[in-house]
């Protein structure tokens, strides 16, 4: 069966992978860049995270089943420290909701 998946973000790509493994002919359509909001860009020599790059504390559900059954997922950890650059200054990455709000 020919199937079109609209959206090349995490969910779209995993869905397309699962459908292809089941023998379907899959076409993924993405209006921007593959990966959706889960990607990095190089801007003026800096690697900038565009969106989500970590999914933590996953409970058993559709996403974990797709990852476990169809993806050869090997975590890639990079040492960047606990800071990010904001207005030419290093800012500590907040670890709680209250810290994000201030």
UniProtKB/Swiss-Prot annotation:
InterPro entries: FAD/NAD-bd_sf (IPR036188). Disulfide bonds: none annotated. It comes from the Archaea. Pfam families: NAD_binding_8. This is Uncharacterized protein in nifH2 3'region. It comes from Methanothermococcus thermolithotrophicus.
């Amino acid at each position: 069966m020919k199937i079109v998946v609209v959206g090349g973000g995490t969910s779209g790509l995993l869905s397309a992978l699962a459908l292809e493994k089941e023998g379907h002919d899959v076409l993924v359509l993405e209006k921007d860049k593959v990966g959706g909001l889960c990607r990095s860009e190089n801007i003026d020599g800096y690697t900038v995270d565009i969106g989500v790059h970590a999914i933590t504390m996953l409970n058993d559900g559709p996403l974990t089943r797709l990852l476990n059954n169809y993806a050869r997922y090997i975590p890639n950890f990079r040492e960047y420290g606990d800071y990010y650059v904001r207005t030419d200054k290093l800012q500590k990455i907040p670890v709680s909701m209250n810290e994000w709000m201030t």
